């Protein structure tokens, strides 16, 4: 196989893992003019997803998907990535000069250490997006940021692949990869839990369509926070309304005890950030933090 600099601009692509991410990125690469030659899909759901997003692409065993591709996309769970790479390297499945890309946010290119003798080109391209595994995601990829980590000589090519998929490449240093991923997981994944808990509480209040009440408020809060950071803080904690917060905590003990620890932890973090940013005066902040500490001790 020729080197990346000698190859035609269009690649034969193998997709390992037809989960929500892999199938969508395969479709995005197809739309960009690349040729997906094979996909691995184990579960019935992944085979159906591959058929929907990658019509006509044959489902193959992983070694066959990898060996026939210029560009390999490893879209598999973080915890099995290193093991799979080591196995493919040990069996000689990789080809010299092959582009091998994984989609993990937590890993950079050090996960390819076991394949160093394979002379492959390692790429870590992580889309900062939540996926449904449908064609809706193709539109969401437009202007979606991708965390890019690779060797210096492959950086232009990695960034070009991201742009071809409709994304915006953002360089992430190898030693900052885990910090990058922790930030995204905390901001997006925990947001789902937070909003779901808020919807549950509104249900307790007798509101039939919690999402209708929350959507304008949450959209405004998110937009304000992205523009202003901690200056966007509002509400009883940021105002120092200790009585209101105490009433909330007492209510949660009765109607939603499973939500109470989350409320306490986030209220404490909010109070600390409000203090540091000057939104909350020291005396009010101390009183708020003392209340929260007392309630946590009584959990």
Residue ranges and their predicted role:
Residues 274, 282-299:
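NAD(P)-dependent dehydrogenase/reductase Rossmann-like domain
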Residues 38-41, 100-103, 148:
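Short, hydrophobic beta-strand segments that form beta-sheet elements in well-ordered domains
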Residues 1-67:
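NAD(P)+-binding Rossmann beta1-loop-alpha1 motif at the extreme N-terminus of oxidoreductases
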Residues 44, 58-136:
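Rossmann-like NAD(P)(H) cofactor-binding subdomain of soluble oxidoreductases
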Residues 8, 47-53, 115-119, 136-227, ...:
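Internal alpha-helical scaffold of NAD(P)-dependent oxidoreductase catalytic cores
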Residues 23, 27, 31, 52, ...:
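Short, well-ordered alpha-helices that flank and scaffold nucleotide-derived cofactor binding pockets
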